[in-house]
Amino acid sequence: MSQRGIRSALFLVVLALPLAQAAAAQVALEGAWVRALPPTQTRTAAYLTVRNASAEAVVISGASTPIAGRVELHETLQSEGMMRMQEQSEVRVPAGAEVSFVPGGLHLMLLDLDAMPAVGDVVELCLTIDGAPLCTPAETRRDAAPAGHHDHQHH
């Protein structure tokens, strides 16, 4: 590539950075939680909703948390009557839309845990969105019910 071509490419990258940062600034992470499992487990899942209020689609290309050696984007799929998880290289969030990471669907797999967080512990969960980290606190709990919510069923 010529010097002029390199300069042109760098110029385009520099121009694109503020646009990517502006889109990422309009992305919100909501309702994050980590599933509590027995302390002997070395993996668990995390869930949240990613809301994109920008006019551009954004791409989630990774995730991290201090409690896990690695985090993978996964989706639970049904194939031939069997449920299986498939790793996703990225998840796209369309402009003006939201994507929910939920049990039985898209989720974050937290692998190589040093220790399972206890119910009530809050951990930092970060997503890589358009190349930049966006972090949120995630409460550890047993199920998807919001903290403090109890389902009272009468028979």
Predicted regions and their residues:
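N-terminal secretory signal peptides that target proteins for export/translocation
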Residues: 1-5
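Short helix-onset patch at the extreme N-terminus, typifying the N->h transition
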Residues: 6-9, 33
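Bacterial N-terminal signal peptides
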Residues: 9-20
